[in-house]
Amino acid sequence: MVSSLANELREGTTKSHSMAENVSFVKSFLGGVVDKKSYRKLIANLYFVYSAIEEEILLNKDHPAIKPIYFTELNRKTSLAKDLNYYYGPDWLNIIEPSSATQVYVNRIHNIGNKQPELLVAHAYTRYLGDLSGGQVLKKIARGAMNLSDERGTKFYDFDEIEDDKIFKNNYRSALDTIPLSDEQVQNVVAEANISFTLNMKMFEELNSSIVKIITMIIVSTVRKFTLKSILATAD
């Protein structure tokens, strides 16, 4: 077992992390360009992803590689369900469906859960630590961009059972380092974490077209307003 799986994961996914931040949808989101239609589709996709992750982690909770990082307080499925009820209504489960990229993502999670459970560590690391690290910032951006007036619609970012995000993340990283893996298995987990980033990027890329439409509408609206002002000024 290597000295620190947590360090290997952090250093081994640096490039993928940077690439994910530069996907158009993510850049637009961070820039405050978020509409409810695209956002609710993202939440729907994440519901399927987390349902798969949490199902497989539960099934493998006694596996030597999973047991150290089995923290039910991280589970997102219930929180996502509350958000989906807000955006789609009470019949949301019969309305949503995974996008093509999301289905590929979900299939992979179930596949490794059945054949190589230790690789689930990579997907848990990529998603959960990412949510804990940037969740509150993304929540603030989403609420501002979509003019949400109450706490509904962004439950995904709330970890109610975790009192201190920083302490929990440190404990999680320490738990990663206790997982009994060979050097080869560690490298496989790092490789899988990079695959996880790629799967997330493909899922985000499917949402790009909606963002492009929004930006185009904003530009057209701005141009029309400017043109109207010019016409009125000329008339005066």
UniProtKB/Swiss-Prot annotation:
GO terms for cellular component: chloroplast. Heme b binds at residue 17. The keyword Metal-binding applies. Its EC number is 1.14.14.18. It holds the Pfam family Heme_oxygenase. Its main location: plastid. Keywords: Chloroplast, Heme, Iron, Metal-binding, Oxidoreductase, Photosynthesis, Plastid. It is found in: Plastid, Chloroplast. The keyword RNA-binding does not apply. It catalyses: heme b + 3 reduced [NADPH--hemoprotein reductase] + 3 O2 = biliverdin IXalpha + CO + Fe(2+) + 3 oxidized [NADPH--hemoprotein reductase] + 3 H2O + H(+). Belongs to the heme oxygenase family. Catalyzes the opening of the heme ring with the release of iron. Key enzyme in the synthesis of the chromophoric part of the photosynthetic antennae. This is Heme oxygenase. It comes from Porphyra purpurea. The lineage of its organism: Eukaryota, Rhodophyta, Bangiophyceae, Bangiales, Bangiaceae. The gene is pbsA.
